[in-house]
């Protein structure tokens, strides 16, 4: 478009800070929220009350990408396989802590606890990168992390990936088994990212932005960039995103109920 774009990262508080910044800005189409499944779906499952409504406070623009979660442990830690990790969790209850930088990663870990029939204890962090760093340093013993943020640390040996929570292995880390291959049949977990604006934004501006994102998502360089970071394009405009978001909120509420996670 020839227009300058300023990226303003606002981590922390389960995305509440970023959401507040977007919703308090002028609704003129110049402030776009690029949010994850945590802010746009998972928070609705984890919190009794939210300072925002992930559906009615936003007008969807476009789905952007999704990335399978990695189950990571310290690179020099004792666990070399998922079976070894689960074995310790069962034989020595209470000895393993997981890091969680958002509501999404917390529910992934609790879903893992439920599927593996173990109990690891959550330690909250301000953001996903802090949780990943805590695993690399051994401050916590495991975490679920986005492929895009953890793969370089896995390649360097600072982290060890025990499994990728997807139906098939990731081309970005082909040596890492799927959770099913590693001994946890059917376990999958993805993070996704989508774009939205305040629902107070005029429809004309919303339509322009949605069309722009549609064009961006079809560019070969967009697909190449996502593949390089271990993600994949998620194509879908406002209506597709609206339906997808509704399904995701239902999914994460079901996961929270099944894993017996109490709402905060």
Locations of regions flagged by a protein language model:
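Stable alpha-helical elements in mature extracytoplasmic
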Residues: 14-18, 38, 42, 81, ...
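Short, well-ordered alpha-helical scaffold segment located
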Residues: 77-78, 149, 168, 178, ...
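Hinge/capping helix and adjacent helix->loop/strand transition within the periplasmic-binding protein
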Residues: 24-30, 45-130, 179-181, 192-225
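Short beta-strand->loop
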Residues: 51-64, 99, 119-124, 141-142, ...
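Short secondary-structure boundary segments
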Residues: 36-37, 75, 146-148, 166-167, ...
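An extracytoplasmic/periplasmic, membrane-proximal ligand-sensing/linker region
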Residues: 155, 203-264
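N-terminal (or domain-start) structured segment
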Residues: 1-56, 93-96, 104-105, 117-144, ...
